[in-house]
């Protein structure tokens, strides 16, 4: 595999006029400290990874409904952790440490559209956000703020039979495409204005500003790329979770392929290449873009109707399989150490049953990703299909980012990597692989 990765790196280097990718943006979800058992992560356990990271993004702050001020989502934790995290700069003086807002952790069922409300707000309320951001960032010693705004998402792909596909095409003649945000153009302009005002305030205080494009947030709706990119030090594309068992419960497919696989009516934008090219083709300098890589996988529950091969797209799935016990996930999410503990290296195995391992299928094309499966038993139980990036495939993506001339890679996040070395004895194998192939 190392030879194949080196070959890919060499191939990409001659097909793109690239500079060495230098950024390794490391996200850290502070709630990992609240987990139990082996998934609980203390700040001192970050040290080994931070020798490789250029930036640490601490998540997450939230947006207070009503006043639209930036605030801590967990005051009891953050009042202690903010200072402890920014104090890491004493050990790693070159490390830039930012506070991130949103990131799909700002759950507010009473106000699900508050980030859009911020865009639509008058100057007084937007100034509340700017002023409170300045105070929270400066008071706690952060170098800047990362905007991971929870904006409306693309509509999930629907599963249709042949008759359903025909009816959908016929109906589209009269109804057009489904519109998620009818005011998207207005919101795009409002986002640009808000960022400009925020940048002006931050510039006077010598603070950084970065953007994180969350999974399935449509860049064409909200981001005026030529006007926006000068306002940000860098832009992180969370190019994963294109499909998940929550968004796509009836079919399983690669969650973060690099390239488009033009088969089985796949949508052409659900891949890394499309997302990266959109920003590059809209005049964003490659050095400002960082490719986001997930250190976790997503698992679907298989039925008897899902078959035995596991080759995606897998049909007749039943939503999310049980997620990681250690990370207490309810939506089919498993961290890398939880994934590796479930894998069998026997490629021809057809294990069944609740405690049986998953059969890993490696992507020899190095284009789409790896997956693993355990077919459902005779009663239709305990079937699992899992899409994930292991350390080797994370290295392939790092090589891709370098070959495209991007600024670097962003890992989401450190607490889902194997920070205890449970898989092979090596700690942070995904971070290490990314760093190695970034050069």
Swiss-Prot record:
Name which cysteines form disulfide bonds. Answer: 26-53, 340-423
What keywords are annotated for this sequence in UniProt? Developmental protein, Disulfide bond, Glycoprotein, Secreted, Signal
Spell out the subcellular localization from the entry. Secreted
The secretion signal range is 1-20
Provide the GH18 domain boundaries. Answer: 22-439
Additional detail = Lacks the typical Glu active site in position 150 that is replaced by a Gln residue, preventing the hydrolase activity. Its precise function remains unclear.
Q: What is this protein called?
A: Chitinase-like protein Idgf1
Q: Which organism is it from?
A: Drosophila yakuba (Fruit fly)
- Its gene name is Idgf1
